[in-house]
């Protein structure tokens, strides 16, 4: 399993084996192309550039403008989603009160915009802009326990997140 053989994970101790992971994975080999390709691109930038330029985006059009401006990545902030882009259509403080599907939904919208822009660019015979910027998304503190966090990460990957960060605090301790 590449996950266990890559030097990317050097120094990481796992209390389980590759065989354990394979046993829990089932037989379907599901690919999440946008997440996989984006994470490779992000990892390459993190290892080969002095910094990765990114701004927060809440809409596909904002992310599209960032790609056109030459930024390296898109950042999707949890507090911005809480305030302006959650699926409850409410304004919340940054306390993980909004629906857990909100961030994956925005990731999907941004990636759908990138896909459309790439299709138009290809149809017009141009290829000057790489619209598939990696999306780094805020998972807050996981919206609950281990299983909640697993489901959130799964949905973020399915939506095409390239990187996810998790706050090192209990949801109940958020200020």
Residue ranges, per PLM feature:
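Alpha/beta enzyme core
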Residues: 2-175
């Amino acid at each position: 399993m590449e996950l266990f053989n890559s030097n990317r994970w050097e120094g990481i101790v796992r209390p389980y084996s590759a065989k354990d992971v394979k046993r829990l994975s089932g037989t379907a080999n599901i690919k999440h192309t946008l997440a996989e390709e984006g994470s490779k691109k992000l990892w390459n930038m993190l290892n080969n550039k002095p910094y990765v330029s990114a701004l927060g985006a809440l809409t596909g059009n904002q992310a599209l403008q960032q790609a056109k401006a030459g930024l390296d990545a898109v950042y999707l902030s949890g507090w911005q989603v809480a305030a302006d882009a959650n699926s409850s259509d409410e304004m919340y403080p940054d306390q993980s009160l909004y629906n857990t599907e909100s961030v994956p939904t925005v990731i999907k919208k941004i990636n759908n915009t990138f896909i459309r822009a790439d299709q138009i660019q290809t149809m017009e015979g141009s290829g000057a802009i790489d619209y598939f910027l990696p999306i780094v998304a805020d998972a807050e503190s996981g919206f609950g326990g281990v299983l909640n966090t697993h489901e959130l990460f799964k949905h973020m990957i399915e939506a095409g997140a390239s990187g996810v960060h998790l706050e090192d605090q209990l949801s109940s301790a958020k200020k």
